[in-house]
Amino acid sequence: MENLKTEIKAEPLVIETVEHLASTLDPTLYYHSPDHTKDVLRQTMELAEEDALDSRDVLLLAIAAAFHDAGFLEQRPKNEPIGAQMAVQAMSASGRFSQAEQDLVEQMILDTQLVMEGPAQISNSRLSPWLLDADLANLGRDDFWDQTRLLAKELEIEIASMLPMTRALMQRHDWQSPAGKRLFAAKKEANFVALEEELSKDN
């Protein structure tokens, strides 16, 4: 896996996209920042390793992770289709990826758009579960509160208004991959309990 990680870190599509985001993204994207993209990339690879995915799948996941928020370069609402098209264009131009692989990466990125009713996320490709879990991994990690504050700052709302929205999201959210369930479920439950306690203070 170490050789694969080195290979992916040297993948031009990943490097160029991450560097472009770092130099170009709106600095008021406090949550959807270049650091978030790097975090999702790292987390995606860790989840893929945990579930022993093959090297080609890990590469496709890494490309999807690098591009999953690239649409923010053009607009904030409904940015996912833009990022998906950026990924497809870059993969096509490289000449190293089949049409099926391009379609797979496109669908993974489209799947990162949160669903407004019912389940918060829906996987429509065989690799989407690992990207989706990486994208919302903070729900089941120690940095849950820090990331929640960053999102509130980005949305320009008070944390008191952010917390009920976060609770609603967590109630509709389920981990999609086996690794996501193993690594994040317990901490997400603990974070949810702490969130409920915080909300109860305001009542």
What do the PLM-derived regions correspond to, one by one?
Residues M1-L29, S33-T37, L41:
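Conserved N-terminal diphosphate/IPP-binding helix and adjacent helical/loop segment
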Residues V14-V18, E50, E80:
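Short catalytic/metal-binding and nucleic-acid-binding patches
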Residues L25-D54, F67, L114-N203:
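Divalent metal-dependent phosphate-bond-processing catalytic cores, especially two-metal-ion Mg2+/Mn2+ enzymes
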Residues T28, H32, G71, Q75, ...:
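Conserved aromatic-histidine-acidic binding/catalytic patches
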Residues V40, V58-E74, G83, V105-Q113:
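His-Asp-centered metal-binding catalytic motifs of divalent-metal-dependent phosphohydrolases/nucleases
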Residues V40-T44, K78-S94:
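An active-site-proximal "capping" alpha-helix that borders the catalytic cofactor pocket
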Residues D51, A90-A100:
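Inter-helical turn/loop segments and adjacent helix faces that build the functional surface
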